[in-house]
Amino acid sequence: MTINHFTFNMKIAGDFNAFNALAAYSVLRELGLNDESIQKGFETYTSDNGRMQYFSKGNKEAMINLAKNPAGMNASLSVGEQLEGKKVYVISLNDNAADGRDTSWIYDADFEKLSNQDIEAIIVTGTRAEELQLRLKLAEVDVPIIVENDIYKATAKTMNYTSFTVAIPNYTSLAPMLEQLNRSFEGGQS
C-alpha cells in the first residue's frame, strides 16, 4: 500500500485491512509518528485471533479468516483470489446459538468467484456442511467438494495437499479449526 509516495508492506491481506491500515496511519501521523516508525509497526503486526492469521511449515502454508456474514465471506474469498498458485479450501458453517440458527446468508455470499481460482479441492465441514456443499454446487464451482462434518478432521485433511490452505470458519467453528491448524503447523505460525 502506498500513501504519500511511501510504500508500506503489511503481513495481512484484504481490502478491508488496507482500510484499517489507512485509518491507523492517519491517527499515528496525527500523533506525530513518522512513516518509518509506522512501517515498522505494519511489518511486524501479526494476528493470532483467526483473523487473517498465517501459518507456514516447510513448503506448506495456510491462512485462516473468520467469516460470520456475506461481507466477511466475500472478503475471505477475495483473499483467495489474490493468492497465486493452487489452493485447497476448508470452509466451516455451524448453526449453533452463538452463530445464529439462520445460515441463509451463505446464499448472499459470492461463492461464484471460486470458479476463477486454481483450486484442488474444497472441504466443507461443520453442522451445516451439506448446506455449504449445496451452495457451492449452485455456484457451479467445478472442483472436488469433500464433506467432513468433523471440523478437526476436515482441517487436518488440508495437510494432505501441498497447495496453500485457505481456512474459513464461522464463529463457533473458529476455535476447533484454529486449534487444528496450530497442531498441524506446530511452531509455524507467522
Write out the residue ranges for each language-model feature.
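Alpha-helical scaffold segments in soluble metabolic enzymes
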Residues: 23-26, 75, 79, 157, ...
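Short, surface-exposed connector motifs at secondary-structure boundaries
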Residues: 6, 58-60, 113-119, 140-141, ...
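Active-site beta-alpha connecting loops in nucleotide-dependent enzymes
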Residues: 66-147, 188
